[in-house]
Amino acid sequence: VKRSEVSINFGTRRKIKQADIDSLFYMASEKAKDSSVEVVSVNPISYIIDDGRVTLEPIGENALSITANLSIIYADKKFIEMFNTIVAGLDYSSVEYISEPLAQALFIIPKERREDLALLIDVGDLTSSISFVKGDGLYALTSFSRGGGFITNDLADAFDISINEADKLKRQIVLSVKGKQS
């Protein structure tokens, strides 16, 4: 995941159209080109209208210029090529690549919460990821090799119990961070 900022100056004040947003996305994709990776998606973090207004929905706004802060998600070209070959061998005509952390965030975190920087922590069995989400894009993403399976093993070792017993114990533990109430 990388962030990119691109702008368009219209020359005269006019309404922003979908074609302008498409142009911003294209500019960011071109700017991000790299021989070893492929752009999987470009998503808006925010748009800034020339008068300084920040929005997630610029279409229809009057502006002289627009700046887009965009999230660009990449995948390794070798990975894409390998799966495209597999999919073609299964007689599928196309495949869509998506970012699982972004899809989770857009589904789980309400749009209003994503206007400010939101955080989604996904603890898997072996790995965990932390997604910082703003607007409809990933602001940052980090993953590390430490998941629930490691906690289960640590509990089994610490209390000298079986993995099944440790897993049951782990599922009874509630970890939470108390945030400010809105």
Give the role of each language-model region.
Residues 1-118, 139, 162-164, 171-182:
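Nucleotide/phosphate-binding catalytic cleft detector across ATP-hydrolyzing
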Residues 120-127, 133-136, 145-149:
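A short acidic Gly-Thr/Ser loop motif
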Residues 141-143:
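Residue-level detector of high-confidence beta-strand sites
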Residues 152:
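Generic structural marker for isolated residues within well-ordered, non-membrane alpha-helices
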